[in-house]
């Protein structure tokens, strides 16, 4: 498996991405970030892709039921600083990556 540039994805990228994916899932399930208007929405984190230098994490998310997707993605982007703060208490890495939230469109093609 390779990323966009053609460089193979390292084991470290996969491992850190999986740690962040699991931690984000728990944050959303327990609503630990206390994001307004998201308490009633279940959010699925389908994948987290890490950059080569582990400074950027692209989290692909999908709201359960598929309604208000764009609104939820915008809310996650708006509160990414708060999510990152809660994430820093769960994931111990040298540099916590910047979080970029993207809508997972793989469900539409499946």
Predicted regions and their residues:
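Charge-rich, low-complexity N-terminal segments
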Residues: 1-56, 62-110
């Amino acid at each position: 498996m390779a990323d966009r540039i053609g460089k193979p994805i390292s084991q470290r990228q996969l491992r850190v991405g999986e740690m962040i994916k699991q931690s984000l899932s728990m944050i959303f399930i327990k609503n630990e970030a206390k994001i307004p208007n998201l308490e009633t929405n279940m959010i699925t984190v389908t994948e987290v892709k890490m950059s080569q230098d582990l400074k950027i994490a692209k989290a692909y998310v999908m709201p359960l039921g598929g309604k208000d997707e764009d609104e939820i993605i915008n809310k996650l982007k708006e509160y990414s600083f708060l999510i990152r703060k809660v994430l820093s208490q769960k994931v111990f890495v040298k540099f916590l990556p910047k979080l970029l939230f993207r809508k997972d469109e793989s469900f539409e093609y499946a």
